Amino acid sequence: VSSDYAKIKSVTLRPVVKTRLPSSLIHVGPENGDSLATPVMPLIGENKGLMMDFDILEDEIRPLQWRIIHCDRNWRKSNLVESEYMTVVDCDFLIDGDFADFSYNTTVPYVHYDFYFPFHGGSSTPEIRFLMSGNYVVQVYEQVYEGEDEYAYESDIVLIQKRFVVTEQLVEIQAEIKRPNLVQYMDDSQQISMKIVPHGFDLSTFDKDLYVVYRQNGRWDNTICGIQPNHVSGDGSLVFNDNRNALFKGGNEFRNFHFKSLRIATTPVDYIEKNDGKYFVYLHPDRDWHAAYTSTTDLNGNFLTSEDTHNNADYCADYADVKFTLPYHRNYYDTLDLYVFGGFNDWKLNDENKMTYNSRLQQIGNIF
């Protein structure tokens, strides 16, 4: 992360941090507990805020802190000062032992942290509210001292940063997903058509002031941005229709598995073993899905933390190594790379989730 937070992404920046729930195993969502909801909150009205929770794989509590950063439409740190978008400025929001729980009866020790924002405050904690809508990032960091003796200086080490959005209902948005009109995209893509009804809101300079962002199932990695309307209707509404740039590939259904219990192997888990005090979950060899499409219910690439034995998965669920296998014949000229990816790693294709080829004509993947 550069000094000006250029193009702030949702990431886990330190390898010691392992987080859970949607997006990079970090959960930022409504405080009502809907773990699959998109982290969006209204500026006005019943503002119940958001919750962030994560795990750090160690057996002691760190004195962490968090802060809010306002971003422009391109997710770069804006030029606004804190007092322009928040009611509280220059305040260190601590994540101490009151916001942390040690894991219970797990093979992998971890500390589970969670906190809510904004909050109403208390006798010693000021209230925090947002003053404007827009793009925001919540950062979790720790302060460390570098150097020695009188030459020591304080430095912020950012562990996690996640995006969220504060909204205002200034216009009416009418949108639908339909089959593309263009023949070459009919069988593999989905088209978004949209109409923005101003209801008195000034959209006369939409070419400069309006910036449209389409997201597929809450993802940030494949957003479609900057789409312009096809025409303006008589009532001033902006119509976005039949635009080949507003297409998402339909893809296929996501593969599903769960190991809520590490004692019983459930479909599609082949078997579970425990070696050196650690669990290993082996999935049945998968198959290529180049076949007739069948609809299945899934989480659109996201995941939930759950555990059958105890009442609270936040600190009772265990970690395991999961082994993925895809039978695949690789030719000498084949340069295809295969990955296991989804919400658990923020939809990133990297070396950690890249599958490797072995002599048994299989692609092998391992995710912890």
Model-derived features with residue positions:
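Long, internal scaffold/assembly segments composed of regular secondary structure
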Residues: 203-294
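Aromatic-rich carbohydrate-binding modules that target alpha-glucans
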Residues: 89-119, 220-233, 323-368
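Basic K/R-rich, polyanion-interacting modules in nucleoproteins and related proteins
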Residues: 282-336
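Extended low-complexity, serine/threonine- and proline-enriched intrinsically disordered segments
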Residues: 58-92, 202-229, 336-345
